[in-house]
C-alpha cells in the first residue's frame, strides 16, 4: 500500500490565513521602525546642538562677550560668530566643524536657496543641513533665524527635522532653542 504524504487543501488554507493574520499584526510594528529611528536620530542631533550652543554661550560668558552683538568666540580652533553669546546659525566652517556625524551641507537658506526651495528641498544624503534661514520659512512658530537638519527622503515641509534657532532684539537674545519637529517622520 502506497502512503501519500502532504498537506490537504484545508491545512494549506489555514496556514495561509494564519500567516496573513501574523503579517497584518506585525507589519505596522516593522513599518514604524524607520520612523522611530528617524525620530531618535533627530532627538540626538537636537541634544547635541543644545549642548554645543550652551557650551559656546559659556565660552562667550568667560570671555566677557555675552553682552555684545556680532562677537567671535573660538572653540577648539573654530571661530564662531555670536550674538549676545548665542552662536549664529552658521553650519559650514562653524558649528558643523564642532559636531560629529554624517551631515551633508546643502547651503544657506536665505541667500542660496530662498523661501520656496528651503521648504521643498528633498534630502538625498543621510542627514542634510540648511543654515542661515529665517525660521518662518519652515515653521511660523519658530522665532528668529535657524539651522535645520533633516533625514534622507524628507524635506522640511514634511515636518521631520531637528533645528537650532535664536532671535535677538538688538540688545539681548529673546529666544534660543534646539529641538525637533517629528510629526511627519
Predicted regions and their residues:
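N-terminal single-pass transmembrane signal-anchor helix
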Residues: 1-41, 48
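Surface-exposed loop/turn and secondary-structure junction residues enriched for glycine/proline
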Residues: 4, 10, 34, 64-65, ...
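Surface-exposed beta-strand edges and their flanking turn/coil or helix-capping segments
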Residues: 45, 54-57, 163-164
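Alpha-helix exit/C-cap motif
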Residues: 50-69
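Intrinsically disordered, low-complexity regions enriched in Pro/Ser/Thr/Gly and acidic residues
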Residues: 74-185
Amino acid at each position: 500500500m502506497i502512503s501519500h504524504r502532504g498537506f490537504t487543501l484545508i491545512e494549506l488554507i489555514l496556514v495561509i490565513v494564519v500567516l496573513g493574520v501574523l503579517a497584518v499584526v506585525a507589519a505596522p510594528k516593522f513599518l514604524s521602525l524607520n520612523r522611530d529611528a528617524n525620530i531618535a536620530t533627530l532627538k540626538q542631533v537636537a541634544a547635541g546642538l543644545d549642548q554645543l550652543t550652551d557650551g559656546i554661550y559659556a565660552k562667550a560668558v568667560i570671555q566677557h562677550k555675552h553682552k555684545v552683538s556680532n562677537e567671535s568666540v573660538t572653540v577648539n580652533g573654530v571661530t564662531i560668530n555670536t550674538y549676545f553669546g548665542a552662536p549664529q546659525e552658521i553650519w559650514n566652517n562653524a558649528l558643523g566643524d564642532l559636531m560629529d556625524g554624517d551631515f551633508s551641507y546643502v547651503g544657506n537658506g536665505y541667500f542660496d536657496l530662498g523661501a520656496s526651495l528651503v521648504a521643498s528641498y528633498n534630502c538625498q544624503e543621510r542627514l542634510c543641513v540648511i543654515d542661515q534661514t529665517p525660521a518662518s520659512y519652515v515653521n511660523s512658530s519658530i522665532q528668529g533665524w535657524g539651522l535645520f537638519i533633516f533625514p534622507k527622503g524628507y524635506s522640511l515641509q514634511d515636518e521631520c527635522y531637528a533645528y537650532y534657532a535664536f532671535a535677538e532684539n538688538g540688545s539681548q537674545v529673546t529666544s534660543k532653542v534646539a529641538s525637533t519637529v517629528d510629526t511627519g517622520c
